[in-house]
Amino acid sequence: IINPDVTLKEDAIDNFFFSIKKVENFGIIAPVSKNEKYSNFNLDLDKDIKEVQNVKGFAMFLNMKNFKEIGFFDENFFFYFEEIDLCKRLKNNNIKIYIDPSIEVSHLGGTSHNEEINKPMELSRNWHWMWSSFYYHKKHFGYMSGLMKILPKLLSSIIKFIIYLIIFNKFKSDVYKYRVLGIINSVLLKKSWYRPKF
């Protein structure tokens, strides 16, 4: 799986096939990116393959036979947490996840959409981040646990929405309004329905 803003280095595929000879029962082997903001791994560390709890989803090599029992991505997620959820289900079934620093990609990050539609995408991003955050915690730890996790974010978003509304910062007030709406929809068990308006 590769995001549209990711390019594989020339030796990435060869290094991947070398990696699978070193590990057993893997579900995911992920590469690293030199883009520090979107990297899977601290590149200052050694080059050995390492077992981890989860990886970022910009590029992943999947061992498909290990997904027959647990399923693939949860389609209830539209943006965010889908790879964390996938990794959680793998780990719950004792299937290993690795990062291999010898497999390198170029990941621009944040460029998968046109700059002209930044505001609608930013509003959508915030809506879905909050929706997915509650849904993930509810799914794996229960409704009340998810509620306790998301409540501070809800209160913070409401306060910031009011502050930015008072000082006439429409963009910021809209961002926090959409955060609140994302949380409310998720807590009310509504689907991840919101789509950006252009």
Model-derived regions, located:
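Conserved donor NDP-sugar-binding/catalytic core segment of glycosyltransferases
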Residues: 6-41
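Alpha-helical elements of Rossmann-like donor-binding domains used by nucleotide-donor carbohydrate transfer enzymes
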Residues: 11, 15-18, 85-89, 131-135, ...
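A short, conserved alpha-helix in the catalytic core of glycosyltransferases
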Residues: 59-62, 66-71, 75-106
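Short glycine/proline- and charge-enriched loop/turn segments
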Residues: 43-50, 71, 111-120
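Active-site donor/metal-binding and catalytic loop motifs
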Residues: 100-120, 133
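Non-catalytic, C-terminal membrane-associated alpha-helical segments of glycosyltransferases
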Residues: 124-132, 143-198
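Short, flexible, basic/aromatic active-site loop/helix in glycosyltransferases
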Residues: 31-61, 68
